[in-house]
Amino acid sequence: MQPKYSQRISSSLGLLLLSALFCSSVWAQRATISDKPDTPFKLATFEAEGKTRLGLALGERILDIAAANAQLTKQAKLPAVAIPGEMRELIEQYARVSPRLYQLANHFKTAKLDGLAFAYALDKIAIKAPIKYPWNMLAAAVNYKSHAQEMGSTNTVNTDNEDPIFFAKSPRSCIIDPGEPFFITPGRNIDWEGELAIIIGKPALNLTLEQAHDHVFGYSIVFDVSDRGGTGRRLNATIPGPNWFHGKSRDRGAPFGPFIVPKEFMPNHANLRIVTKVNGVVKQDASTNMLIFDEAHMIRYLTSILTLHPGDVIVTGTPDGVGTARKPPEYLKPGDEVTIEIEGIGTLKTPMRAATGAKQ
């Protein structure tokens, strides 16, 4: 064989070898980034540098999902996956995008996040309500036995033969961000109610108890601000009983957040500690295992009435310890701060302020 042909063959073999090594390296890198839910994360909507972003929280850091996805796709030579920039759309498309979210969490959990433009410290950004806005926010009334008893009820509930009581809160008027104030109208008796929120993941209608959990996306926190009465015009007495709209639909009456935890990371959702404090003093301390109607029974009932949509919020009820049941009754006042902490989800803080005009 002549030398020049030998050199060409050697050169070609070298290029093939380098190409093979490169491809092996790329595929090895792909293979090492698991697309399984190995690393727990929380989801959030947040604002940083004047822009609203969808975030994936890992410990005390939160990643801008869009930017982190772009970098990992390029760095690891992964197939492109378009991830929605709005929470409700992400929930709707979760089956498609969740493997990439798992890859982001699995990769960046061990990465050095300092200096990465898309990684933010939680205390340096503004967390927003995770969904603005769900189609429905539906809330269970008197759904803890201890709360029913403190409110004067002696009834025994049969969850197999009876339906829960629900009311609606207007998402557009009631939902506010974590840390945003609720404005107290002078003379009104405003009470605290800390509650676990269930986030729906798929369209749901006429579900059985067994089908219910499959249609859940995850869990969050809602402060069900409750108006117990006070000064002002009286409600007419044409129909006896409480006026749920008057008591539960105050403007800004549903602080929501800070995170949504996907259900795969909350296997103990039926046994979570829930604590509500006012100015640091514990007022409510209970577990979600004390619910009268559990997740499945609530979803079965609601979907027998209407269709639930991805991103819809079910507010599951509050335990005992509310202000109106205390002796003497206690109500919130301007300057107070309510904090609601639910195990595994986070802490929702809401300051109380005085309403100073017709426009809050």
Where are the regions that the model predicts?
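Bacterial N-terminal signal peptides that target proteins for export
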Residues: Q2-L15
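A generic local secondary-structure boundary/capping motif
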Residues: A31-S34, A44, A126-A129, T154-T156, ...
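N-terminal non-catalytic cap/leader segment that marks the start of a structured domain
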Residues: W27-D160, K359-Q360
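Catalytic-pocket segment enriched in acidic/His residues
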Residues: R30-D38, H147, I184, R228-Q360
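Non-heme Fe(II) oxygenase catalytic core, chiefly the N-lobe of the double-stranded beta-helix
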Residues: N143, S170-G230
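Bacterial N-terminal signal peptides
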Residues: S12-S25
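Structural signature of FAD isoalloxazine-binding scaffolds in flavoprotein oxidoreductases
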Residues: N155-I176, W192, K333-E343
